[in-house]
Each structure stands twice: as structure tokens, then as C-alpha cells.
Amino acid sequence: MDEKTKIYDITIIGGGPVGLFAAFYAGMRNASVKIIESLPQLGGQLSTLYPEKYIYDIPGYPSVRAQELVNNLIQQMKPFDPTVALEEAVQSVEKQVDGTFEIITKKDTHYSKAIIITAGNGAFEPRRLDLPEAEQYEGTNIHYFINDLSRFSGRRVAVCGGGDSAVDWALMLEKVASSVAIVHRRNAFRAHEHSVNNLEKSSIAIKTPFIPTEVLGNGDKLTHITLQEVKGDTTETLEIDDFIINYGFVSSLGPIKNWGLELERNSIVVNSKMETSIPGIYCAGDICTYDGKVKLIATGFGEAPTAVNNAMNFIDPKTRVQPMHSTSLFE
């Protein structure tokens, strides 16, 4: 059986922190695992929205930087070598005659004996730069995601936005880029006060209150942007190599609403086994709901093993739901 038709034991839809931990735990249960993620990188909101922010309610960490937590989770699951499919938004899930699930994305078709949905608040789509010519340069040097800082080494970069993501990325880029400018339509930034203080002390050129009104290029890549002062007459042209847009993201259940699952207020209803209304499909993390549900990363970390253990029992009813403790497994 080739990779395209391989039937995995467990397919995890959503590569955020809960999905990563579920992949690790499923690996401990000797399951073959695939993660399908709609974004270009693993980590979900932690990597996309606030990679440099500190999280204070993860057990065992007095504080941990969001991206560091993601990196640790990826490292934790690596020994089990799960298959990862990035930039694939799941469009439909269908149960086949033989009981396996067919999972269709915009790019491919996947097969699995059980599914765990860990999609957080749903699929993310960036709010795009609404200017003529902008779409032409998306994917070359207009960016909505950063998954490799080194690609900006020695380059002139402009960041557009005023929230945590924009300020965080500008500060990170300052360490590698030859120059960084941040463009925001208001004088005040919405980012965390500590980050704004660091921004004001940095070498980053702060362009406020300005908005981009034109992007100029040579047909192959963007070379300049024109800025217009909000409620003013001042214009400015910046010569840049890369333009990073941080206007935020829109998340929704999207196609999940059409999969036949019981829903309640844009969440998937589960029972105490983390089982949905469709046998063989489980949920963990913010996307699911039950009486008394608390939406925290720490809660999702507890739900993931419950989902995995019950999924394994669904695949093979002779399999114990309660596994051995990890101290015994790794001796």
C-alpha cells in the first residue's frame, strides 16, 4: 500500500498544542499517526498569533514562551515520527463501507481508522491586504505567516499591523533583517505594554498613523510600498524586500459544520470519552464542548489522552482503554 492509500490508525485534524500532544500520546500507544494542519506550520494560535508571549498556566512551567512550548511538543512527538500534512484544510469526512474514514482536503485524500479533531477555534484564514497588485506578490514577498526567520536575513522588511503578532514579529525580525519598519493606522499599538516598550527602544522605524495605499513591483516581486498618513496629506514611499501583513485572522468551523456532527454554539459536542455523535470521531481542546467545559490549553492536554485511549479501543475493542503509565513504557 503506497502513502496515498495508507490507512492510519489515528488522524489528528489540527496541529496546535493539543493536537501535537495527542500525536505524542497516540505514538505511545503504538498507533500510526497523521496530523493534518491548515496552516503552513505546526503550533496553531501559539505560533501564528503570539509566538513570543509567555503562558503562565501550563503545569510544570512557571512561565513558558508560546513558541518554546510548541517546539517542545514537536520534539516530544518526534520519536514516533508522525506523518504531517501542512497547508491542507479538511473539506469533508466520509465513513466508508469498511468502517474507515475518507478525509478529503483541497490537496489530497487521506484514510484513517479513527479521527481526533483538535482544531481549536476552527480553520484560520488571514485578513488579506486589500490593494490592487497585492495578490500578485503573495507567496513571493508579501507574507501572512512567518515560519523561518532566516529567510529575512539581511533584507529590508516592513510589517503592517498594530497588535501582538505585528509587534512580536517586528522585534524578532530586527535581529536578522538589515532594516525593519512597522506600519500602523493608529498612533497607539494594541500589543502588550512590555512589547511596545521594547519596540520604542529598538531600531525599528515606527510609521504611525499610516496605512499602505499602493504596492509597487517589477512583476516578479514587490519592491516599494506607498504609505498615506491617516487624516493627513503626508505620503511616504518605502523601498523594501518583504512586506509582512498582520491584520489578524478569521477563524470558523467552516466545513466542519457539514460533517454531520452534533454541534452546540460553534463547538462539537462530546461525551466523557471525548467521543462525538459519530462513532470513531473524537475531539479534544477548544473545539469541543460538554457540561462544565473550561477552554484552556491545560484542559486540552488532559482531554487528548482520553480521546486517544478511547480511539484505540474503538479500533480494537480488545485494547485496554487504561494504558500502562509512561514510566513503565520507557524503561
Curated annotation (Swiss-Prot):
<feature type="binding site">
    <location>
        <position position="327"/>
    </location>
    <ligand>
        <name>FAD</name>
    </ligand>
</feature>
<feature type="binding site">
    <location>
        <position position="90"/>
    </location>
    <ligand>
        <name>FAD</name>
    </ligand>
</feature>
<feature type="binding site">
    <location>
        <position position="45"/>
    </location>
    <ligand>
        <name>FAD</name>
    </ligand>
</feature>
<dbReference type="InterPro" id="IPR036188">
    <property type="entry name" value="FAD/NAD-bd_sf"/>
</dbReference>
<comment type="subunit">
    <text>Homodimer.</text>
</comment>
<feature type="binding site">
    <location>
        <position position="124"/>
    </location>
    <ligand>
        <name>FAD</name>
    </ligand>
</feature>
<dbReference type="InterPro" id="IPR022890">
    <property type="entry name" value="Fd--NADP_Rdtase_type_2"/>
</dbReference>
<keyword id="KW-0274">FAD</keyword>
<keyword id="KW-0521">NADP</keyword>
<comment type="similarity">
    <text>Belongs to the ferredoxin--NADP reductase type 2 family.</text>
</comment>
<dbReference type="InterPro" id="IPR023753">
    <property type="entry name" value="FAD/NAD-binding_dom"/>
</dbReference>
<dbReference type="GO" id="GO:0050660">
    <property type="term" value="F:flavin adenine dinucleotide binding"/>
</dbReference>
<dbReference type="GO" id="GO:0004324">
    <property type="term" value="F:ferredoxin-NADP+ reductase activity"/>
</dbReference>
<dbReference type="Pfam" id="PF07992">
    <property type="entry name" value="Pyr_redox_2"/>
</dbReference>
<dbReference type="InterPro" id="IPR050097">
    <property type="entry name" value="Ferredoxin-NADP_redctase_2"/>
</dbReference>
<feature type="binding site">
    <location>
        <position position="50"/>
    </location>
    <ligand>
        <name>FAD</name>
    </ligand>
</feature>
<dbReference type="GO" id="GO:0050661">
    <property type="term" value="F:NADP binding"/>
</dbReference>
<protein>
    <recommendedName>
        <fullName>Ferredoxin--NADP reductase 2</fullName>
        <ecNumber>1.18.1.2</ecNumber>
    </recommendedName>
</protein>
<feature type="binding site">
    <location>
        <position position="37"/>
    </location>
    <ligand>
        <name>FAD</name>
    </ligand>
</feature>
<dbReference type="GO" id="GO:0004791">
    <property type="term" value="F:thioredoxin-disulfide reductase (NADPH) activity"/>
</dbReference>
<feature type="binding site">
    <location>
        <position position="286"/>
    </location>
    <ligand>
        <name>FAD</name>
    </ligand>
</feature>
<keyword id="KW-0560">Oxidoreductase</keyword>
<dbReference type="GO" id="GO:0045454">
    <property type="term" value="P:cell redox homeostasis"/>
</dbReference>
<keyword id="KW-0285">Flavoprotein</keyword>
